[in-house]
């Protein structure tokens, strides 16, 4: 049997075959034998792979986006031969849902030229048949392409182009390295991103968390919470080389072939079940920081100095308020809280959805209605009413009665 990229075909492959094939194809499994999926997670694991195959980016879409990137690169070369256009984000790390936007970055030797080159690039793209907006900011211009009328990429073509965002590129390299270490990461991340999107809790503009924030929460769980861990912490490896970019150390152990085998053989269903339960009941958002800079993953807001909201000047000279209601330390830009957009009501909704997911997966009823895990929640009002204090307290203090891991 050969199941490429963990493709589950209902009625053809069993859950045991899928999980066995995943471990057989991982370099980390060379010294271990496959362990059967626990009965309690077989059906959920099967369901997860069925959903995963529906939501992941197709080979056709991926090739179309690569073709679009090639076209955009030709446009850039015509106005700036020395500049480089690179992809970053979920498309490049392998963690993209279908119909995802493209995130691109123009790299140049001198930031002084960015405004001039950005405007010329935008004008060249418009002449080439793309449509969009040029957002002139004080220090970092942004090009937002919203459709294409000439090159065959369609009216739904979406692309954001930034300039000299080197830290984001290194973040992408880190995530890409983790996807190469274990084939379970990609479906797990995509399912969590899809779940957050369906539950309306992945919008930084409305007080919840970005998709990148959820990716970091998944990684934190797989590195620092579950025992034995699925991944080592590549940032803290004694073999990693220091590399300073924009004042931050972006070095990590990228010698993946030398990383020792993982001893965690949990099924995808089991990992997701534990992930939802941990953030529903065990992670303490009022006190803890999701961090990758401590060997044990333990860091408090007090230690970090992230206890009160602060303000700073953004790239467009606007005042940005940094909140620490949910604290997620960026792996490289450690002064940046990835969860800074989360409001009190946003955390209430996020925590509530984690609890709802955990309760569903812990249900004693049979069959468990797994479809409801991804049922679309109603769109919340633009202005959230202040959460009732009593209800908030009840939510934050709810426990699942199970302290085992």
From Swiss-Prot:
Biological processes, Gene Ontology terms: negative regulation of nuclear-transcribed mRNA poly(A) tail shortening; polyuridylation-dependent decapping of nuclear-transcribed mRNA; RNA 3'-end processing
Effects seen without this gene: Stabilizes urg1 transcripts.
Mutagenesis / variant outcome for changing residue 133 to A: Impairs binding to RNA. Also impairs binding to RNA
Presence of the UniProt keyword Manganese in the record: yes
Mutation effect (residue 333 to A): Leads to diminished TUTase activity
Enzyme superclass (EC): transferase
Binding, ATP: 340
Basic and acidic residues: compositionally biased ranges: 386-397
Effect ascribed to mutating residue 277 to A: Impairs binding to RNA. Also impairs binding to RNA
Keywords: ATP-binding, Cytoplasm, Magnesium, Manganese, Metal-binding, Nucleotide-binding, Nucleotidyltransferase, Transferase
Domain PAP-associated: 267-336
Any one GO molecular function term: magnesium ion binding
Stored InterPro entries: MTPAP-like_central (IPR054708), NT_sf (IPR043519), PAP_assoc (IPR002058)
Catalytic reaction list: RNA(n) + UTP = RNA(n)-3'-uridine ribonucleotide + diphosphate; RNA(n) + ATP = RNA(n)-3'-adenine ribonucleotide + diphosphate
Record's protein name: Terminal uridylyltransferase cid1
């Amino acid at each position: 049997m050969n199941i490429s990229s963990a493709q589950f075909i209902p009625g053809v492959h069993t859950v045991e075959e899928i999980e066995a094939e995943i471990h057989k194809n991982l370099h980390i499994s060379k010294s271990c034998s496959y362990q059967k999926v626990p009965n309690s997670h077989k059906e959920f694991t099967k369901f997860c792979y069925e959903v995963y195959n529906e939501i992941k980016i197709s080979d056709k879409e991926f090739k179309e986006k690569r073709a679009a990137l090639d076209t955009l690169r030709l446009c850039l070369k015509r106005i700036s031969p020395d500049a480089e256009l690179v992809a970053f984000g979920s498309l490049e790390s392998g963690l993209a849902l279908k119909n995802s936007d493209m995130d691109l970055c123009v790299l140049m030797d001198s930031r002084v030229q960015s405004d001039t080159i950005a405007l010329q690039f935008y004008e060249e793209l418009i002449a080439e048949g793309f449509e969009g907006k040029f957002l002139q900011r004080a220090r970092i211009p942004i090009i937002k392409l919203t459709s294409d009328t000439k090159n065959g990429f369609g009216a739904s073509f979406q692309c954001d182009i930034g300039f000299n965002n080197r830290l984001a590129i290194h973040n992408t390299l880190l995530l890409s390295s983790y996807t190469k270490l274990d084939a379970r990461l990609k479906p797990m991340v995509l399912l969590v991103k899809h779940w957050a999107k369906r539950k309306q809790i992945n919008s930084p503009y409305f007080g919840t968390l970005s998709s990148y924030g959820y990716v970091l929460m998944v990684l934190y769980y797989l590195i620092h919470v579950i025992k034995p861990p699925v991944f080592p912490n590549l940032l803290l490896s004694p073999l990693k080389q220091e590399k300073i970019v924009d004042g931050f150390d972006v070095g990590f152990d990228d010698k993946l072939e030398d990383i020792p085998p993982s001893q965690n053989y949990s099924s995808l269903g089991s990992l997701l079940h534990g992930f939802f339960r941990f953030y529903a009941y065990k992670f303490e958002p009022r006190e803890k920081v999701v961090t990758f800079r401590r060997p044990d993953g333990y860091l408090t807001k007090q230690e970090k100095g992230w206890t009160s909201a602060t303000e700073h000047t953004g790239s467009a000279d606007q005042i940005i308020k940094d909140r620490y209601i949910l604290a997620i330390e960026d792996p490289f830009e450690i002064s940046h809280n990835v969860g800074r957009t989360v409001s009190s009501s946003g955390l209430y909704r996020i925590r509530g959805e984690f609890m709802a997911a955990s309760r569903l997966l812990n249900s004693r009823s049979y069959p468990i209605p797994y479809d409801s895990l991804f049922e679309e929640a109603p769109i919340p009002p633009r202005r959230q009413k202040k959460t009732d204090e009593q209800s908030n307290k009840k939510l934050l203090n709810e426990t699942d009665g199970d302290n085992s891991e």
